[in-house]
Amino acid sequence: MFSRLYLEITTCCNRACSFCPGTARPAAFVTPETFRTLAAKLRPYGQYLYLHVMGEPLLHPQLPELLEICRALDFRVTLTTNGTLLPARQPVLLAAPALRKVSVSLHSFEANEAGDFRAYLTGCTDFARAAMAAGVLTDFRLWNLDGAQTKGLHDRNDEILAHLHAAFSEPWQRNTWGWRLAKGVFVSFGERFDWPDAQAADRGALGRCRALSDQLAVLSDGTVVPCCLDHEGTLALETSSARTCRRSSPPLWPARSAKASRKASVPPPLCRRCWATPNASADPKPPPIAS
């Protein structure tokens, strides 16, 4: 069993964030039929399903149907979003029994000049308050702290934190990654990271790899990859198209290939250029927050 299964439902996004590499793959929205087939094939491998690799999942025009399929398959769903569509999608999200958690990348807004920042933050915190009542977790992400290569990329963090304090004025409680703002509402901190790129510098053969250890991912075209950071399908294990997945006998991906990839003595070139290596900075401590 994997603790995280990723099933990308779209490659499209309504933002152009500096930290996101985007994808050269075609624009796509997974149809409910294909989603049902792929999700059912994934279900024996775990219960916690993340509906993204690339793309903004709240853009999907048939999101209610996808969430209902997740309910029927008894998945616990996490959505990661830039937050801009939360007000419009709130009724759909909070009516979905399968939804467990929404992670909101608040650091996405600083990479985009268009839009009303205060209105954006209000939409995010209003959603979090409504989600509390519905029993859905909200994790606000500020993954933009200074690292060895990423200085000065968090100009609006003070404004964001001030807004969060105003929205959640009860005493905050420290946890491993940040703070608990209220019941079911959190803010987590981390350094901005560079997505693995075959053209980037080699970071070595050792690292904290989770590929095929506690996660795997399926791209919108059905390509199975070892982890959620393989956003172009470079390390494809199998192309599990809807047609392929309808076969009853083969596993989701070739077991021999998966085992070989996991235990390879020489990691693939993409893995040697991944941020999750000893050369990456250690988990950062959150900046001080006034009580």
Q: Locations of the language-model features?
A:
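Flexible mid-to-C-terminal extensions adjoining Fe-S/redox cofactors in radical SAM and related proteins
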Residues: M1, V224, L229-S291
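Conserved alpha-helical substructure of the radical SAM core
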Residues: M1-V102, N112-R118, T122
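Processing junctions and N-termini across compartments
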Residues: L7, T11-N14, R203, S265-P268
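Secreted/processed peptides and extracellular or luminal domains of membrane proteins
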Residues: F19, T23-P26, Q215, G233-T234, ...
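Residues that line or immediately flank small-molecule/substrate-binding pockets and catalytic motifs
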Residues: A24, V53, L106, L252, ...
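Short, flexible loop/turn elements at secondary-structure junctions
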Residues: G55, T81-G83, S108, N144, ...
